[in-house]
Swiss-Prot record:
PANTHER family: FLJ44216 PROTEIN-RELATED, SKI_DACH DOMAIN-CONTAINING PROTEIN 1. InterPro entries: DNA-bd_dom_put_sf (IPR009061), ElonginBC-PRC2_ViralRestrict (IPR052119), EPOP (IPR027971), SKI/SNO/DAC (IPR003380), Ski_DNA-bd_sf (IPR037000). This is SKI/DACH domain-containing protein 1. It comes from the Eukaryota. Residues 370-389, 396-410, 449-461 have a biased composition (Low complexity). The lineage of its organism: Eukaryota, Metazoa, Chordata, Craniata, Vertebrata. Pfam families: EPOP, Ski_Sno_DHD. GO terms for biological process: regulation of transcription by RNA polymerase II. Belongs to the DACH/dachshund family. Residues 337-353 have a biased composition (Basic residues). Residues 411-429 have a biased composition (Acidic residues). Residues 746-761 have a biased composition (Polar residues). There is a cross-link at K688 (Glycyl lysine isopeptide (Lys-Gly) (interchain with G-Cter in SUMO2)).
Amino acid sequence: MGDLKSGFEEVDGVRLGYLIIKGKQMFALSQVFTDLLKNIPRTTVHKRMDHLKVKKHHCDLEELRKLKAINSIAFHAAKCTLISREDVEALYTSCKTERVLKTKRRRVGRALATKAPPPERAAAASPRPGFWKDKHQLWRGLSGAARPLPISAQSQRPGAAAARPAAHLPQIFSKYPGSHYPEIVRSPCKPPLNYETAPLQGNYVAFPSDPAYFRSLLCSKHPAAAAAAAAAAAAAAAAAAAAAYYQVSAAGPQPKAAAGAGGPGSLSYRCKRKRGGAKDCLLAPHAGARRLLLLPRSYKAKAAAAAAAAAAAAAAAAGATCLERFHLVNGFCPPPHHHHHHHHHHHHHHHRAQPPQQSHHPPHHHRPQPHLGSFPESCSSDSESSSYSDHAANDSDFGSSLSSSSNSVSSEEEEEEGEEEEEEEEEEGGSGASDSSEVSSEEEDSSTESDSSSGSSQVSVQSIRFRRTSFCKPPSVQAQANFLYHLASAAAATKPAAFEDAGRLPDLKSSVKAESPAEWNLQSWAPKASPVYCPASLGSCFAEIRNDRVSEITFPHSEISNAVKRTDLTINCLAEGASSPSPKTNNAFPQQRILREARKCLQTTPTTHCADNNTIAARFLNNDSSGAEANSEKYSKILHCPEFATDLPSSQTDPEVNAAGAAATKAENPCTDTGDKTLPFLHNIKIKVEDSSANEEYEPHLFTNKLKCECNDTKGEFYSVTESKEEDALLTTAKEGFACPEKETPSLNPLAQSQGLSCTLGSPKPEDGEYKFGARVRKNYRTLVLGKRPVLQTPPVKPNLKSARSPRPTGKTETNEGTLDDFTVINRRKKVASNVASAVKRPFHFMANFPCPPSLIIGRDGDLWPAYSLNTTKDSQTPHKAHPIWKWQLGGSAIPLPPSHKFRKFNS
């Protein structure tokens, strides 16, 4: 060791020990890794070493001891690799440069892009600027063209901005995408900075910023609307182009008002859209859409926050929040405006459609006053708040859904909702007092819902899930919900027809039917859903509002509310029992999100939801509503099931139709039976609870389609069979908290959904024991003893089942289990394949049991409840055999297992 020289060198503040071997400073690679390059992944370092062709020296025992002596390596190290100083430097430089400079390069690149683009703006030739432009165009479109626009305008067309109608619109609406984009590209260079500094940016949803995309979405569907929107937007943008985003939003209403006052463009379009045609509405909505684009949920959330902050007074705050949503949706919301906007926003709205709208003005004011009552709840006037909230909700949901589903849909829907809202407001103006009262009751829920929703939508579905969990207050709404439910059901019952007639009905039709077809599927269901919301609303003031009135007013409300609900879906569901509409609306956007929200809402509000859900479903089923109505009697028992279906569908992809049908029936039934209604609510909630969410997420489409039939049929059977029991159980559970019913249904629901077959849950297949995986299974001791247990595993996972089953254990047990025949067959099969043999056995279905029904659910009080109780387990719908509840209770099986099963794990 004497000849080994050692020393220490400090590199970048790190003290490394080295040995001098053959005249070279050799550093312990382990120390270089752990100390010098500690923040750099080992794989990166190794790659760099390979790239640099670092020569490694494997130290001998003496060197190893020396390194330990100078504490360069761990005392317990058995070997060490040394690398030379040059290699350490090269490696360090390489790794650090690769990591640090990458970010630096990006920053530099951005800076260069920002600075260089001005010339490039003029030239518009640089590929990089083009890249930035494209990249930022999205931002531009999202945040509103205002900031980027000024930049572009400055750079390229000082006077051209005026020339281009869409110059100030988000690029998506730009008529000159080609020229605009370059500008956008350049402006984005600056705007990115602006956005970074701007609080709005973070919240923005990332829409495809492709102008063509939005334009195609909006313009293709509503060319006239696109033009009108472009004009209106241009005017608004021109006014607010340089203004901050908020101002732009604020400006939106003014231009819109101007358009409304000045010509058909805004007001007419809106009116037409509401009354005359979805297409016309869309025209106006384009402005709305533009605004919507400008008002991604993040802005909305911001607006909501701003509104809340600004609205020191609860009323003002409430109004602001709702307005914020509404404005955001319409692009009207300057955060400050929100308060008075909430009250006046409608006025703006109204002013836009001034003749009809102003009539609302008083009603709106009335509603705002109710808002005064409680900030969040009062926040939204029933219609207004609903619409605003709806819009806001839409925005927030819309933000979410935009990202998940389609921006254009969001925009359009928002527009539609805006229109709808106006429509709703107009109608409200017509039924001022009744509307107001309706608004007040509904507006509480709606505002709360919209507030929570808008916020949550920005957050995430998860947050929504939690929110829905926390929304226990809906139970309080239950009484109202039932009441609303009746009204809603009546409205839904009438509405479905109305909706069917919606095409013929001027107002409702315009909003609902015309918009539905003209706008997207989303919108179609949204309008339908919107009516649903109305019914809930109507529920509050149904006395004042006749069914037709409900149809008309509710419908617009509903539509807007629905939009709101989409976002506020959970809240609304809970608060208003309008979760279904919300989910439906949500459905259009992010189906899964909607599903989740729907199920959340349903889950949260057993009764309330159901009513709204039914109504919503009926409305959503605008087209199917007649059928639904026709079937409503038939579904009276199924009602719960349809409700369930509705919830699930609303949660699911096709909720509109499926949920609509179920909802329609449900709505009608509820109207007929209050008692049943309550149960349906419970059922609905139960089903919709966790199961829907889990299953939807896995296979929302499947569930939607299957659920419609399955829920209806199976649930029909299930509910008819168990209705009396469930009714009692549910009633009792309702008293306990919807949690219990929820629990009960969820077990079934999860199965049904997981299987895509409610029937499996609702009505165990009598042939389960006899047929497995399509093969006839002998009824042996096991089958007799276990009964239809296989049903649980029958879930449609046949392929999975076989693969999931453990062939060996199955085969083994089967030998003991089976009768002689079975045994022989099994032996034969075993030889062929143990998997096949296991088919005869009660196999463990991996996925069938997988989304295990929740054993604990959130109760009304927000606390955890057992998902199943002796109550519910006694019902015909006992928990899934795989459910943990069987592990909690003694005698999980009434019948003892056969000896072969005694020690099996799957006997639960």
